[in-house]
A protein has these predicted regions:
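Alpha-helical transmembrane segments in inner-membrane proteins
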Residues: 1-334
C-alpha cells in the first residue's frame, strides 16, 4: 500500500491547513476585485468596524462578501455532491450536472417561478431539491442494471438525454411565462446576484448536509469498495446508498438555486482529492469541500476580470477537456 493510499494524519492535517489558508487568502483578494476600487484597509474596517454610511463598506458587506461566500458554498456543495455520487455508483465520470441533478433542479425552479413568481428563496431551494431528485432518479434507474450495477457509460448517456429533455422543458416554460432572463442565468451559472437573504437559509442547510455525510463517511468508503463486501460486513447497503444520494441531491439542488448550472466541479475535484489523500471518504470529503470552494471562487474572480463572464463557462473550459480525458481512459470504475 502506497503512502498516498494510506496517508498519515499529519499529512492530512497539512492539506487541510494549507487549503484553508489558500481559501482565506483567495477570499480576501476576491473582495478587492470589482468595478469599484477598494483598498485592503477598507475591507478590514468593514469587517471589524462597519460603518453603514460608508459607500465602499456597504459594497463590501452587501455585495462582495455575500458573493464570495456564495461561490465557496456552491463549490463545496457541488464538489461533495460529486464525490458522494462517484462513491455510491463507483463511477469516476459521475457529476451532478452529468447525471441530471442540475438540469432537474433548473426545471423545478423554472416551474416554481412560473407558478409562484414572488416565492421565497426557501421554497426555491426545496423546489431545486425535488427537481434534483427527479432528474437523478430517472438517470440512475436507466443507468443501473442487475447484471453490472451502475455502468459508467450508460449513466453518462442517460444523463445527457435526460438533461437535454429537462433543459428543453425549462426553456419551454421560460418562453411561455417570459422567464428568459431567469432561465438564461441558471443555464450560464453565476453568483453575482446572491444576497444575505439567500445565504441565511443556504449556509445552515448545506452545513447540516455536510455534517451528516461526514458522520457516515466510513460506510460510504466501504460501499465504494463494492456492494458484496459492504453486505458481507453487515452494512445496510440500500439505506446507506439512499441517505448518500439524498444528501447529494440536497447539495446539488441548493447549489443550483443559488448559482444555476455550474458543471464539472463535482467531476474534477473528487479526483484531485483522491489523488492527494487516497480512498478514505472521511478524508476525501473535507478535502473535496475545500478544493471545490477554492475552484468556484477562483472561477468567479476570473469571471469578474472578463466582464462578468458566466462562472459555468469558466469552469467548463477546464472541465470539458478533463471529462474527455476520463472518457478516453474508458470511464473506469473507482
Amino acid at each position: 500500500m502506497t503512502n498516498r493510499e494510506n496517508p498519515t494524519p499529519l499529512k492530512f492535517l497539512s492539506y487541510i491547513i494549507g487549503l484553508s489558508m489558500i481559501l482565506l487568502i483567495t477570499l480576501f483578494i476576491s473582495t478587492l476585485i470589482g468595478d469599484a476600487k477598494i483598498q485592503a484597509s477598507t475591507i478590514i474596517e468593514a469587517i471589524f468596524n462597519y460603518n453603514p454610511s460608508n459607500q465602499q463598506q456597504n459594497i463590501i458587506n452587501e455585495i462582495r462578501i455575500p458573493r464570495n461566500i456564495a461561490a465557496v458554498i456552491v463549490g463545496m456543495a457541488l464538489a461533495v455532491s460529486g464525490a458522494i455520487i462517484q462513491g455510491v455508483t463507483r463511477n469516476g465520470l459521475a457529476d451532478p450536472a452529468l447525471i441530471g441533478l442540475n438540469s432537474g433542479a433548473s426545471f423545478a425552479l423554472a416551474l416554481t417561478y412560473a407558478v409562484l413568481p414572488n416565492t421565497s428563496f426557501l421554497i426555491l431551494m426545496f423546489a431545486g431539491f425535488l427537481g434534483a431528485i427527479l432528474g437523478g432518479a430517472i438517470v440512475l434507474m436507466i443507468g443501473r442494471s442487475r447484471r453490472d450495477g451502475f455502468n459508467p457509460m450508460r449513466i453518462i448517456l442517460a444523463g445527457g438525454a435526460v438533461s437535454a429533455m429537462l433543459t428543453a422543458l425549462s426553456q419551454g416554460i421560460a418562453l411561455a411565462f417570459r422567464l428568459n432572463q431567469t432561465v438564461t442565468f441558471w443555464t450560464a451559472g453565476g453568483v453575482s446576484g446572491t444576497t444575505w437573504s439567500h445565504l441565511k437559509w443556504a449556509i445552515p442547510l448545506i452545513g447540516i448536509a455536510l455534517f451528516i455525510i461526514l458522520t457516515i463517511s466510513k460506510q460510504l468508503t466501504i460501499l465504494n469498495l463494492g456492494e458484496s463486501l459492504a453486505k458481507g460486513l453487515g452494512q445496510n447497503v440500500t439505506m446507506i446508498r439512499g441517505i448518500c444520494l439524498i444528501i447529494a441531491m440536497i447539495l446539488a439542488g441548493i447549489a443550483v438555486a443559488i448559482a444555476g448550472q455550474v458543471a464539472f466541479v463535482g467531476l474534477m475535484v473528487p479526483h484531485i482529492a483522491r489523488f492527494l489523500i487516497g480512498t478514505d471518504y472521511a478524508k476525501i470529503l473535507p478535502l473535496t469541500a475545500l478544493l471545490g470552494g477554492i475552484l468556484v471562487l477562483v472561477a468567479d474572480v476570473i469571471a469578474r476580470y472578463l466582464g462578468e463572464a458566466p462562472v459555468g463557462a469558466i469552469i467548463s473550459f477546464i472541465g470539458v477537456p478533463y471529462f474527455l480525458y476520463l472518457v478516453k481512459k474508458g470511464g473506469r470504475s473507482i
